[in-house]
From Swiss-Prot:
The chain crosses the membrane at residues 31-51, 66-90, 99-124, 146-165, 190-212, 421-444, 451-473. Its main location: membrane. GO terms for molecular function: histamine receptor activity. It is a multi-pass membrane protein. This is Histamine H1 receptor. InterPro entries: GPCR_Rhodpsn, GPCR_Rhodpsn_7TM, Histamine_H1_rcpt. The keyword Disulfide bond applies. The lineage of its organism: Eukaryota, Metazoa, Chordata, Craniata, Vertebrata. It holds the Pfam family 7tm_1. Histamine activates the receptor by forming hydrogen bonds with transmembrane domains 3 and 6, squashing the ligand-binding pocket on the extracellular side and opening the cavity for G-protein engagement on the intracellular side. It comes from Bos taurus (Bovine).
Length: 491
């Protein structure tokens, strides 16, 4: 029996320097049962992942497209590669013909390479999301992600060229044995080493570098958020009560902007009244903040609603003071999240904290310094304009800081995604590094190969396709809830 095929650069004849006696049926039966169970579990779990993403709307995100690509590659390993490996193990020789052998080799190389590249592009996606959250948010669409995934699979399918057409490039290549399933380049050391570097070592080193950057950025962001959260009172303490909106100490003879806005108008009859709009909540989409429609569809950012201000009235001060402010009835003002809300955990609290934070940082307007007396004619227009300008200024500050909070909310989501990526990369490296180290050793020393060790490293790499579907619900609450829903498991 020769060593069966494995991932992108595995060859049958690698262990020809150290042959062992074929195992008998009594020894093979338990092994076949275990390996068959692994194959069935791999197929079942990856089908569950694909069905979960298809059926659950919350999982229709750009990031999960890379998960789907990885699951498809793992599914091919479980459906085609593992069973044929077990069959080859039972037969001790290849008796299914050369065409089926080439099909098996092609599927093995393509699926294993696609799995590696899927983890790689997933890492790049997480890296860009963390390093440039708002800029990449506009660029990060399902179309672009799909193109990237197709490019990764296209590169993976390039393995078919040397597998099927090696003899067209190297006519003097010896004919393979009919009882072996091996590629025509099984003994070409330079080609195997080159492909191992391109397919595994280089992507792995880049992924480790990317993840180090991701970890550093997320850690700095968390430290920054702790400083911000420690600077302002929590939303639960404030309760959005009118009396709690009086922030900051009041200097003698001066009023804070919030107190000015809360002051009831005096009945002077001079200023025009802006009639309040209807009290029905209106859906708000800010072009620079929450108007990314594609992200709403992806489930990353939801909708929010604002109840309009009840009353806005131009209010003059005492006669001759020349100062006017907008008076807003705060008793009915509310900010209510929609049914869908922000899909990210803690998004609502984060947004509310930012609003309260901004309320403390509003700069004083012309309430601190008396303005020049306005002419009697057109005085009410001037006073009304002053109030509206202050409201406009307040809105601009809220919107500007909202941009920063969108970045913060996005980073919170990416922190959890980085955790998921960390587990995926750890499983990937632990499962595949033994095989590729062993491969590099025997590429230069065929007599150093041990068949049983080599067989173990092959299946350890295969088991990576079994572990990946277990990582998704472990690190993603939406996956966990969807899996429980599909399997009818009560929380």
């Amino acid at each position: 029996m020769t060593c069966p095929n494995s991932s992108c650069v595995f060859e049958d004849k690698m262990c020809q320097g150290n042959k062992t006696a074929p195992a008998n049926d009594a020894q093979l039966t338990p092994l076949v049962v275990v390996l068959s169970t692994i194959s069935l579990v791999t197929v079942g779990l990856n089908l569950l992942v694909l069905y979960a993403v298809r059926s659950e709307r919350k999982l229709h995100t750009v990031g999960n497209l890379y998960i789907v690509s990885l699951s498809v590659a793992d599914l091919i390993v479980g459906v085609v590669v593992m069973p044929m490996n077990i069959l080859y193990l039972l037969m001790s020789r290849w008796s299914l013909g050369r065409p089926l052998c080439l099909f098996w080799l092609s599927m093995d190389y393509v699926a294993s390479t696609a799995s590696i590249f899927s983890v790689f592009i997933l890492c790049i996606d997480r890296y860009r999301s963390v390093q440039q959250p708002l800029k990449y948010l506009r660029y990060r669409t399902k179309t672009r992600a799909s193109i990237t995934i197709l490019a990764a699979w296209f590169l993976s399918f390039l393995w078919i060229i040397p597998i099927l057409g090696w003899r067209h490039f190297q006519p003097k290549t010896p004919e393979p044995r009919e009882d072996k399933c091996e590629t025509d380049f099984y003994n070409v050391t330079w080609f195997k080493v080159m492909t191992a570097i391109i397919n595994f070592y280089l992507p792995t080193l880049l992924m480790l570098w990317f993840y180090a950057k991701i970890y550093k950025a997320v850690r700095q962001h968390c430290q920054h958020r702790e400083l911000i959260n420690g600077s302002f009172p929590s939303f639960s303490d404030m309760k959005m009560k009118p009396e709690n909106l009086q922030v900051g100490a009041k200097k003698p003879g001066k009023e804070s902007p919030w107190e000015v806005l809360k002051r009831k108008p005096k009945d002077t009859g001079g200023g025009p009244v802006l009639k309040p709009p209807s009290q029905e909540p209106k859906e708000v989409t800010s072009p620079g903040v929450f108007s990314q429609e594609k992200e709403e569809k992806d489930g990353e950012l939801g909708k929010f609603y604002c109840f309009p201000l009840d009353t806005v009235q131009a209010q003059p001060e005492a006669e001759g003071s020349g100062r006017g402010y907008a008076t807003i009835n705060q008793s009915q003002n509310q900010l209510e999240m929609g049914e869908q809300g922000l899909s990210m955990p803690g998004a609502k609290e984060a947004l509310e904290d930012q609003i309260l934070g901004d309320s403390q940082s509003f700069s004083r307007t012309d309430s601190d310094t008396p303005a020049e007396p306005a002419p009697a004619k057109g005085k009410s227009r001037s006073e009304s304009s002053t109030g509206l300008e202050y409201i406009k200024f307040t809105w601009k500050r809220l919107r500007s800081h909202s941009r920063q909070y969108v970045s913060g909310l996005h980073m919170n989501r990416e922190r959890k995604a980085a955790k998921q990526l960390g587990f995926i990369m750890a499983a990937f490296i632990i499962c595949w590094i033994p095989y590729f180290i062993f491969f590099m050793v025997i590429a230069f020393c065929e007599s150093c190969c041990n068949q049983h060790v080599h067989m173990f490293t092959i299946w350890l790499g295969y088991i990576n396709s079994t572990l990946n579907p277990l990582i998704y619900p472990l690190c993603n609450e939406n996956f966990k809830k969807t899996f429980k829903k599909i399997l009818h498991i009560r929380s």
